[in-house]
Amino acid sequence: FIDKIASFDMEQTILIKNVRIFNGTDEKTVMGDILILNNRINKIAEPGTISAEGTIIDGKGKFLMPGLIDAHWHSYMCCNTMIDLLTAETYYTQLKAGVEAGKTLMRGFTTIRDAGGPVFGLKRAIDEGIIPGPRIYPSGSLISQTGGHGDFRAVYDDPRPFGCCCLTHTEKIGAAIIADGVDAVTVAARNNLRLGASQIKLMTGGGVASLYDRLQDSQYFEEEIHAAVKAAENAGTYVMVHVYVPQAITRSIQAGVKSIEHGHLIDEATMELIARKEVWLCMQPFTLDDNQYPTQEQQEKHKMIVQNADNAYRLAKKYQVKLGWGTDLLFNPANTKNQNKDIGKLKNWFNNFEILRMVTYDNARLLSLSGS
């Protein structure tokens, strides 16, 4: 029904009758009717017990579930290449993101948590009904230390004081910002919040696509991470961090971070810490087939992550951590069509009910950390 519902005015009343309902939390489905008012579910009841004026859809006994949530999506970077990010004209890249947002919705994703990038304008266009797309929980610019996972500068670019006029293209468009020190991190976080960020995204460890770091690197001092946490908490929200290795995960948690992104190289002691502190772990079931990195070094880093994914998921289940799911598809427009396929990869560790709950109810709980 998503193609029909997506074309409706958000003020419309919609009654979907005679459907088999999965509510996101209960393993058994039930037959019933659903009333939607102003783009939100208003009532779920037994078949034939709701009367309403407006659009009526007969589900004819088909399966109906909450919209899918991708808790680690990059609305801008998923459909633009790295070369686009570094050199392309902004109108071109933003138009591509707008088209991709409609495709994302048609794949069944009604909400995404954007894990970094210039999407405030895209969110506004969707919210105002200018273009179709999912609800977006934006993070704004990725916040990175010099030489960190979000440092997209050329090799010959010199370090410069935070806030000076010599910004890179990626900083000017709002894709990433380099901030070193407590004061700079505080300003960067506050500026993202000023622009409408739902949460703050910080890079506290090395990454696969990085130009200047190793996968095992820890990034940012604890006091720098805590500065972002304090800025977020003052605004009623939280910090999510890109990180893979135990020491950097531990440092992030000690600084007050609420959502660990990736974490594939985690050890048992650190997983126990995540569980004890009730921190969220948002992982991606990466496989070797995902490897489209151009350099040998990047390919080796990706292989290391894939080889450790099974251990990380098994530890997460053992300690019953609060687990979210996202795709983190980046810099390959041809790969976005695999967003749904990545859900199926979870079958290596979870049954069908656990998977559906994770990509609906569990991810919704994760997103609720930023408030209403």
List each language-model region with its residue ranges:
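His/Asp/Glu-enriched, well-ordered alpha-helical/loop segment
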Residues: 234, 307-372
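Histidine/acidic residue-rich metal-binding segments in metalloenzymes
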Residues: 183-281, 302-323
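Divalent metal-coordination and catalytic microenvironments
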Residues: 19, 39, 61, 69-72, ...
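Divalent metal-dependent hydrolysis catalytic cores, especially in the metallo-beta-lactamase
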Residues: 96-122, 133-142, 197-210, 238, ...
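Active-site mouth loops of central-metabolism enzymes
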Residues: 82-95, 164-187, 238-240
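Active-site environment of divalent metal-dependent phosphoester hydrolases
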Residues: 76-78, 111-122, 206-211, 244-250, ...
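Histidine-rich, glycine-flanked metal-binding segment
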Residues: 11-13, 21, 25-65
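Metal-associated gating/positioning segment near the N- to mid-region
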Residues: 62-128, 146-153, 223, 255
